[in-house]
Amino acid sequence: MIPGRMNSREMRRLMAQMGIKSTEMDDVTKVIFKGKTKDYVIDNAQVTMIEAQGVKTFQVVGTMREVPKEPEEKKEESFPEDDIKLVMEQASVSREKAIEALKASGGEPAQAIMNLMQK
């Protein structure tokens, strides 16, 4: 049982006997946890890395604030330029039609060409 009043030197000695290493990460000033809808930012962070049985655990102390994420605009799908050119040449279609066909075929050039040829 750990006594109620233990100084830091005794605590470090006891942790060392148990195979637990504790390291202060003095060069860390900010920690950011990225979530799906918001980020959690911890400013003026004091970070301690605790290693026990090969597992590293981090203790973070500081001032936390939540930063909501703005909804991202839907990114335009991009396909390799070679695939676009191949579909354009083989199906004799414009670049726009080739890209539409690649979208419809899940990015598969052969399927895109076959779909265009059947029309």
Swiss-Prot record:
SMART domains xref list: NAC
Superkingdom assignment: Archaea
Pfam families documented for this protein: NAC, UBA_HYPK
GO molecular function: RNA binding
Span of domain NAC-A/B: 5-73
The entry's keywords: Protein transport, RNA-binding, Transport
Record bears the keyword Transmembrane helix: no
GO BP, sorted A to Z: protein transport
Role according to the record: Contacts the emerging nascent chain on the ribosome.
Family: Belongs to the NAC-alpha family.
Subunit structure: Homodimer. Interacts with the ribosome. Binds ribosomal RNA.
Protein name as catalogued: Nascent polypeptide-associated complex protein
Species of origin: Thermoplasma acidophilum (strain ATCC 25905 / DSM 1728 / JCM 9062 / NBRC 15155 / AMRC-C165)
Lineage: Archaea, Methanobacteriati, Thermoplasmatota, Thermoplasmata, Thermoplasmatales
